[in-house]
């Protein structure tokens, strides 16, 4: 008989919601993200509002991420390059950077379902 494991995570706010989401789906990605890459991307994902939707990776938001995560300019650039190389983010024709759609969770609540099969 199959055992169904259900667990809810409640009370995650801001970047913690997005970092946890990335941690849950990470083993299923073609190329896994490091813990720091998940932290950087999750922080960018947490920004809300019209300005964030237009250019989430603008200088303003990069500065915010550097402050929150205590990163240097070079450190953030290295993580962004790694995220780009892994296909987590991409540069659009107009120069803006966007997050790969398969990484974006639903707002406020995300459900997951998967199964593993032996053999």
Per-range role (PLM):
Residues 1-29:
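Long, low-complexity, charged/polar intrinsically disordered regions in eukaryotic proteins
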Residues 33-61:
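Short helix->loop/beta-hairpin flanking segments within DNA-binding domains
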Residues 66:
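The alpha-helix within a helix-turn-helix
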Residues 70-85:
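Short amphipathic alpha-helical interaction segments
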Residues 81-97:
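A short, conserved structural fragment
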Residues 104-119:
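Short, amphipathic alpha-helical interaction segments positioned at domain boundaries
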